[in-house]
Structure formats: C-alpha cells, structure tokens
Amino acid sequence: MNNLKINLHPNDEKIHFNEKDHSYKINGKSIQFSVSQIIDDFFPKFDSEYWSRVKAKERLDFLGKSYSIEKLNETQKKIIDEWELKRDEAAKKGTLLHEAIEEYYNRGELTDLIPEFKFFQEFLKKYPKIQPYRTEWRVFDSKNSIAGTIDMVYKKKNGDLFIFDWKRSTKLVNDIGTVIKSDFDYGFDELSNISNNSYNKYCLQQNLYKYILEDNYGKKVSSMNLLVLHPRYHTYFHIQVPDLTKETEFLIRKAREKVI
C-alpha cells in the first residue's frame, strides 16, 4: 500500500491537533470550534445526573425492597461510574480500530487482534478498486474558526473525492443494518427539524467536512459515507450520508457570527 503522504496539502503545515484535550490550532492560534463541538452546541445535552437517578431508582425498585436515600445515592454513583467505564473502553477500542486502518493504508500492515477489522477487510474486498487519498486528514476553515479530522478520503478517476468516517458503534444501526433514527428530542434554532441522535450528528459532521474541503481546499466531494464496524454485528454496514446543505449553512453562519 502506498504511503498517502504523497497527497499532502499546503494547509497541513498550518494545523496542529492536541491529543490530550482534543483541541486544534491554526498557525499557533486556537480555533473556536471543532466540527463536533459546533454541532453539539445546537442539541440538548445529556443530563447524566437526572438519568442516572432514574436508572438507580429502576434498579432498586426491580429488587422489590425498600431502600434508603443513602442506598439510592450509592447506586446512582455506581451507575455513573459504569457509564464512564463503558465510554472509556469504547473510546479506546474505537481508537485502536482507527489506528489499525491507518496502519494498513500507510504501511500495508494487517492485524487479527481487532475483531471488527475483518469487516473492514470485507468492505475492501467488495470495493477493491477504490483509490485511497488521505487518512485521518485534519482540515480547517480559518475564516470561521472550525477544524476537524476526516477518517478517510478516497479519490475518483475524475479527481473528485468521497469521504468516510469509521464508526465502531451500536447506536447507528440495528442488527440488520437499518438506521436508528430516534426522535426523543430535537435540535435548536434552525436545527429544530433534526432529531437528536448519533446518525444525524454524524451526518452533520460529514456535511461540514464537505464544506471545509470544497471551500478551503479546492476539492469537489461527490459523496459522504459512514462505515459501521462493530463486533456485535455479523458484517459491516455502509451508510450513505444525505446532503444537509441548509443545516450546514446555518452552522457555518453561527460559527461566523461568534468569530466576528
């Protein structure tokens, strides 16, 4: 596999990513928004205090015994700790998968230590002619102080690009690959038509990446995609991302207002 450093862009020298706090700098100056951050600003935040209390009561009620407020507090803390541990483990495993795919594309190295990597290999077998262009590409829009990292960029024969994000998640599709579009609550302002779920947020991320590449890098992005790779499933699931032009323009406009 060819080293994809041959496709460097002049902007690559200007952007720096801090792994510890997941922040970006452009020419040494901190940017205001990551792609995920500007999106999260327009959706309800998960109230862990409230929902952990609800789950603690459910857990104790299931036992069919009376309990003290101290026992309720203890159970609530245990649930919060369980959530944090699960989140940390998922993040670590997701990072390992991303690194394994990057190693494959940049060094030709394969691994059998990550179960879901075999699904990525199945994807490659189905599309053997796709041309890799960049992995883990950090991109930015200096005018609006936004930056993010695209997991994978492929190139068509006509020069157009198409982008992928790898998702090691069970929140995007069910066991037969149907997209989970829960609509418990919705976004704010001009995103009030967008339900608050992982699928919609990832679609907005992809649309922002497309905007950044086309407006700042002189590229044409022909399609946006998510590839779900999780050991719970029997195979990979490929999700094509729709164009959300109006919503993307809104996010860019709000970012610009805060920068100015």
What does each model-identified segment do?
Residues M1-L96:
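Charged, glycine-rich intrinsically disordered N-terminal tails and low-complexity linkers that flank
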Residues M1-N2, H9-K14, N106, S142-K143, ...:
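Accessory terminal regions of nucleic-acid processing enzymes
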Residues S30-Q37, I114-F117, N196-N197:
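Secondary-structure junction/capping motif
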Residues S36-D40, S169, P242-T248:
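A short, sequence-level motif marking secondary-structure junctions
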Residues S195-I260:
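Metal-dependent nuclease catalytic regions and adjoining charged, substrate-binding loops involved
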